[in-house]
From Swiss-Prot:
Keywords: Antioxidant, Cytoplasm, Disulfide bond, Oxidoreductase, Periplasm, Peroxidase, Redox-active center
Keyword Disulfide bond attached: yes
Species whose genome carries this gene: Escherichia coli (strain K12)
Protein name: Thiol peroxidase
EC number: 1.11.1.24
Location of the Thioredoxin domain: 19-168
A Pfam family reported for this protein in Swiss-Prot or TrEMBL: Redoxin
Disulfide bonds: C61-C95
Tree of life domain: Bacteria
Main EC class the enzyme belongs to: oxidoreductase
Any one annotated GO CC term: cytosol
Record-linked NCBIfam families: PRK00522.1
Amino acid sequence: MSQTVHFQGNPVTVANSIPQAGSKAQTFTLVAKDLSDVTLGQFAGKRKVLNIFPSIDTGVCAASVRKFNQLATEIDNTVVLCISADLPFAQSRFCGAEGLNNVITLSTFRNAEFLQAYGVAIADGPLKGLAARAVVVIDENDNVIFSQLVDEITTEPDYEAALAVLKA
């Protein structure tokens, strides 16, 4: 099943469906800034915020990383994972230059299956192969408790809705 979002007002197809609240989070393996593999299981017992976006080198994506870095200080027992197709070197450069130490950046560059599993793979248009903008919140037991596939890729996600489910 595919979904439609928009990029600069134009429809874009996204393969599969984003996980819905109440479903079990799919396992994944992504790449950390030191090029090591990181799995969902490594965050067992913690709540996880997956901030998924096309590239850290765009203004809106960078803004979302900055905002979630700030919000990460307000929520206990929670890790914020910022996930994009950027190489770990670019992610590290950005976070280092910005002084962002409260989020963990992860890359899909060796494991594009993540995009399919989480229903964020852009299937057509100029961003084909990248991730659509989305937020998925997962509880300590790896159950999805919130998800948002942002309708317009060039707009920021609903931070307050994601934060509200973590403070509930």
